[in-house]
C-alpha cells in the first residue's frame, strides 16, 4: 500500500527561544529559512537505507518484524534526541515498512483538545499518527491522548452546560509516533504509553561521510576522495546540517563549472559562509574570541559575554553555547564561562601566564 502523508502547514513550527539567530545560521540543526524539514529526494524510505544509529536500527527492525508477524499495529513509538538527526525520517520509514498511511502533525499545531480529537476520530485501522514536538502539546490534549493511546477511545462531549454528557467513541487500533528534543518535558503518564522508546545520538564523522556520499549521489554531485570528510568535519554530527552544507557546495561547483568537487573546493565554499573545520561559525568564533581576548579566558558572566558579541543573552546560551560545551571549547562554571585550552589553540592564541587555568578547576 502506498503511504499517504497529511501534513499540517504549522507542523514544524520551531520554539521561539533564540529562533531569530538560529534560523539564520548555516550550522543550525533546525530548518533554516524556507528549508523544508521533509526532503523526499534525500530521505530513505526503508530502514535498510537509513544510515547511522546501528543499535537503534536493529532494535526497530526487530520491533517492526514482530508486529508484522503478529499482524497487529505495533506499540506506540517515542523518538527522542537533538534536532536534525532523523526522527521524522524514521517515522516515515516505519509507516512505509508497515505499508500503512501516516498522518503528520505537531504539538504547536494542536491548539485545543478538540483539534486532536478530530484527528484521532478520523484515523483508519493501523494508521500511524506522527506528532512532532510532542512535548509541546497543550495539557488538555495530552490528557485526551493518554486515553486514546491506551484504551483506543475518545470521550466526546455532547450538549452544553449542566446537561452536557460524555459519550465514549471507540477508535480503531493505531500507532502514535512521537518525536521530541526534550524528553524530560514529557509527563510521566504520557511517556508510559510508549511501548518503544528510541534515543538518537549525534553521528560520528565516519557515518556522516557515508550519508554525505549517498546524498551526493542522489543530488548528482561527484565528490573526490576526502571531500565528504571535509563536509563531515563541519557538520556537527548532524545529518540535516551535512545535507545543507552539501547543497551549498553544490552551488559552488555549479557556479565554478566544476565536474567534481575536491576537498579544497569544500574548504573554499564553506569558508565563504565562515564555517571552519570544527563546524564553528561567525557567532561561535565571536563568543570564543570575546572570552579569550577581552576576559583573558574567563570566567565571564553570560550578560557581559552577550553584550560583547552584540547578541541577546538567551541567544548565546541556547543557540551558541550547547555545541561549544559539547565539543570542549567552553566550560560553564558557577563564576561564569571559561574558554578551554582547546579554544585558545583553535583561535591560534597562546595563553599568557595570567590566563585562567581550567586545569585548576575543581
Swiss-Prot record:
Region (Small ATPAse domain (RuvB-S)): 204-274
Region (Large ATPase domain (RuvB-L)): 15-203
InterPro entries assigned to the protein according to its UniProt record, in alphabetical order: AAA+_ATPase (IPR003593), AAA_lid_4 (IPR041445), DNA_helicase_Holl-junc_RuvB (IPR004605), P-loop_NTPase (IPR027417), RuvB-like_N (IPR008824), RuvB_C (IPR008823), WH-like_DNA-bd_sf (IPR036388), WH_DNA-bd_sf (IPR036390)
Keywords: ATP-binding, Cytoplasm, DNA damage, DNA recombination, DNA repair, DNA-binding, Hydrolase, Nucleotide-binding
Binding site for ATP: 42-43, 84, 87-89, 150-152, 193, 203, 240
Top-level taxon: Bacteria
Region of interest: Head domain (RuvB-H): 277-362
EC annotation from Swiss-Prot or TrEMBL: 3.6.4.-
Biological process annotations from GO: DNA recombination; DNA repair
PANTHER family per record: HOLLIDAY JUNCTION BRANCH MIGRATION COMPLEX SUBUNIT RUVB, PTHR42848
Subunit structure: Homohexamer. Forms an RuvA(8)-RuvB(12)-Holliday junction (HJ) complex. HJ DNA is sandwiched between 2 RuvA tetramers; dsDNA enters through RuvA and exits via RuvB. An RuvB hexamer assembles on each DNA strand where it exits the tetramer. Each RuvB hexamer is contacted by two RuvA subunits (via domain III) on 2 adjacent RuvB subunits; this complex drives branch migration. In the full resolvosome a probable DNA-RuvA(4)-RuvB(12)-RuvC(2) complex forms which resolves the HJ.
Comment, domains: Has 3 domains, the large (RuvB-L) and small ATPase (RuvB-S) domains and the C-terminal head (RuvB-H) domain. The head domain binds DNA, while the ATPase domains jointly bind ATP, ADP or are empty depending on the state of the subunit in the translocation cycle. During a single DNA translocation step the structure of each domain remains the same, but their relative positions change.
Protein name: Holliday junction branch migration complex subunit RuvB
Taxonomic source organism: Bifidobacterium adolescentis (strain ATCC 15703 / DSM 20083 / NCTC 11814 / E194a)
